[in-house]
Amino acid sequence: FMSTQRTADLIIGGFKDEMTARRKYDLKDSSGKILATLYFPPITRFDRQKAQQLAGTDEALTISTQLLCKVAQKEDGTPAFDMSDAPMLQRQIPEKVLNDIELFMMDIEVDISKAKNE
C-alpha cells in the first residue's frame, strides 16, 4: 500500500535514474576541434548552495563558474577542474565560451531565434 511511503521518498525514488545520468559536452575551439569532453551529473540545490558558499558572494556569474568547477567531470568521473581554476577561467577565456558551458551544465535550453524576436 503506497500511502505509507513518505512523499519525499516517492519523489526521490522517481528521479533516481535521472540523478545517475550524466550529460556529455564537447568543448570545441573556434575551428571545431574538440579540446575536452566534459560530463555533467544533474545539479542539486545542495551543489548550488556549496558553490555559493565557495564563491563567497551572491553574484550569479561567480557562483556559476564555481559550480562548473565543482560538478564538471572527466569521462572516468574524476573532477575536470580544480576549484582554484574558477578565477582563471573567468579571466582568460571568452565570456561566450564560459556562458555556453554553464548554460549546458544548468540544463538551460536557449533558443536564440526566439530570444531575438521577443
Feature-to-residue mapping (PLM):
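Short secondary-structure capping micro-motifs at structural edges
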Residues: I11-I12, R22-Y25, A51-T57
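Compositionally biased, low-complexity repeat tracts
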Residues: D9-L10, K28, Q73
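Short, surface-exposed, charged amphipathic helix/loop patches that serve as local interaction elements
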Residues: S31-E118
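Alpha-helical interaction segments
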Residues: Q5, F15, D29-S30, P94
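Short acidic-hydrophobic surface loop/beta-edge motif
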Residues: T20-K33
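A short, compositionally biased
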Residues: F15-R23, T65-L67
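Low-complexity intrinsically disordered segments
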Residues: F1-D17
